[in-house]
Amino acid sequence: MEHSIDQDTLELTGSLDVRCTAELRMILYGLIDRTPGDVVVDISRVESVDMTTLKMLAVANRVAERGGHRVVLRGCSTGVRRLLHLSHLRSMIPVEPAERADAV
């Protein structure tokens, strides 16, 4: 996993799995603490996401909601959206609407 932060957006690349969950949690919670509004997690360049990571993102969103904001996923692939739905985590993690290719 590689990451970069641009104001309220955490941009991730690579694979998100159990091996990077602790590091990702530390980075994300730090961003939640210092961001006055919603935090966006951009996973548009992520190769794969596992259930451990999605559960951690759901808990991070719950923590953010206590402070009046949210953790919002951006750039979810069809596979990630399907996994969120099948795992019943979709209601626990806000997801930006998919951009339509013909909207450009």
Label the model's feature ranges:
Residues 1-52, 58-104:
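STAS-like cytosolic regulatory interaction modules
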